[in-house]
Each structure stands twice: as structure tokens, then as C-alpha cells.
Amino acid sequence: MIQRRKRRGDSGKSGVENPILMEEEDDDKDEDRNEDDSDDDAMTTIKTMRGKGDGLVSSMLRERDLDKFGRGSEYAYVNESDKDYSSVIVAKDNAYGEKYDVKFTDVNGKKTHFQMGDVLGEILPEEERRATRTHGSCALVGNSGTLLKSSFGEEIDGHEAVMRVNFAPVKNFKRDVGVKTTYDFSNRENARRLVEKGWENSRPDSVALFFEGSSPTNRKRIFEPLVKKYGKSLKVQFLHPGFVNRAHDLWNALKEIIEKEKNKQFHDKPMSGWYAVNFMMQRCESLDLYGFEPYTSKAKATAPYHYFDQVQGVVSVHSFDFAVFAYQKFAKVFPLRIRTKSGWIGAAED
């Protein structure tokens, strides 16, 4: 059974209860309340319990190969005994041959592959560092307008590693969002803007991390032109497609369970922030989420969609409220917390 690791420096559980939370900037928002469920099917799915007798393994695990989500005494997606499931990013040690062939298992369980090609293959990191955590404390900063007037900047920059989403600006917002950036996690649309319009919010020391590299169209029309345009001045990495598929599988598994708990239907498509959270959980000893608050009709009256512009939010593609329910379940088996102006949610217990 997977046991939660304690966050260094935690003294106890936060007294803040069930605030209205949300996710980052990418698409839409929804609202619902969460209850502190302790022993439920979702926790069994996350922990990937493997009992020697009956009763410990949930029907979810019998129906799906969710044991790939667990390893050792940590919450992780990698399984060191199975090489096809052990990669988080694409690297030269898991992309083979002259054309950098990437092997993975698709969403239907079929073994498949694609070639990164010379342009992208040459910029891949040498080693994947599979199954290791490379950072201590980490912050993942979403783009919610609720970050305005939060004064979280210094707190965010105090983490060992910081990820930002879709190249969000930090200039003029230092007090609220900080400036430190270790990773820039981006979807293909923002990668395309980078190619077409340039990089306004250049952060030369950060790693640009993309999760849609398995598509040949994306590689030819977006990522290859991106690498050719910026060369070595832009550090680029790609999530391994097998890891992306496993993160999507986990979304679907938890969605089925949480829909039953909440008696509510959620959208099928994960937002980019879902993959960002799952990546950081593989690379960090602990993770704090900032700007992850649901954009709803109620929230619209109190804060803009983004902290850096006046774009109008939409509510028809993703279920950000579901993502928060899932993150709160993650927090029961991994040192993950969600920051709000009123306090912390999901703080690790003693």
C-alpha cells in the first residue's frame, strides 16, 4: 500500500475547510463542493493497493491495469520492472536509432512507436533520470486572476523549483506570482504562438516542456520550426507519450469514481494543468499549487480569468472542479497542497 510521505516543515493539518477551488488558465471552469472522503474507491485507485487476500484490491484495479501507477512507497507512475512504463520524458536513452524511435503503449493497450526525427532528436536530453525525484519543494503556478493582490510571490520563489503554465508573464506581477521559473509547461497553441509571434516572456534559464509531441502534425508544423527558430537558446523537453497516456487513464479512472460520489457529470478532456501536476509529482518531493481556483459565474464577479489580461473565460471544455477534487485525493498519498488567500488545502498530516 502506498504511504504518503511527510512534507518537510509541516506541523499539522490546515484548519481551512472546503473553499471553492479551481485550476489554471487553460480553458473552462465549473463549481462544486468537496467533502473529505477518507476511505473510498478513488483512494484505492491512487494507492494501487495489492492485497494478498480479497478486499484490498478494488474493482477498478481488477478491471484496469492501474498497478502501473504505483511504485515502492511513493505515488508515482513509473514501474521500474517494465521499461515501457518507466519514462516520464523523451530522452536519448529511451528514443532509439538514428531517427530517435519512441516506443510506448497507446490508450488501447497496443504497443506502438513514432520517430522524433533528426531536428527534435538532437535536442533531447541524454538521460531520462527515470524513477527519480530531482527537486525538493516545488511550486506550480496557474494563471488564475485570484492571484492578483495575493502577495504570494516571495513564497513561490522560495521553492526549489517553480513551474509556470503557457509562458505566463511575471514582469509587473512579481509581488503576486514571483519570478523564479524552472519549467515552462505549454500546450501546442502557446507553442505555436511562440513560433509565429516570438517569445515576449523569455526565460532563458527555464526548460520549455511540451506534452503533445506524439502528433506528427505538431512535430512538423510547431515543434520542429520552434527548435529551428530558437536553437539552443530554448531548452526543450517532451513528456513521454506513454506517461501522457497513463495520466489520461488516471483522469478517466478517477472521473468515474468521483462522478458517482458527486452525482455529477464532468468533461472527458483533461486540461494541460493536469499533465503539469502529474509531471511535477514525479520530479518533486512535495508540490504546492498556486492559482488553481475554478472559474465560474460566481468567480467571474470577483476575479478575472487570468491575472495578466482581461480575456473572458469559457466553461465548455474542461472540468476544473473535478481536477481539484482529484488533487485533494492526491494530497492524501503525496505531499501536495493547494494555496488560497485563506490558507492551505491538502496539507500533509503529522
Question: What label would you give each PLM region?
Answer:
Residues 1-45:
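Long, low-complexity intrinsically disordered regions of secretory-pathway proteins
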Residues 18-19, 41-42, 46-350:
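Metal-ion/cofactor- or nucleotide/acyl-coenzyme-handling active-site neighborhoods
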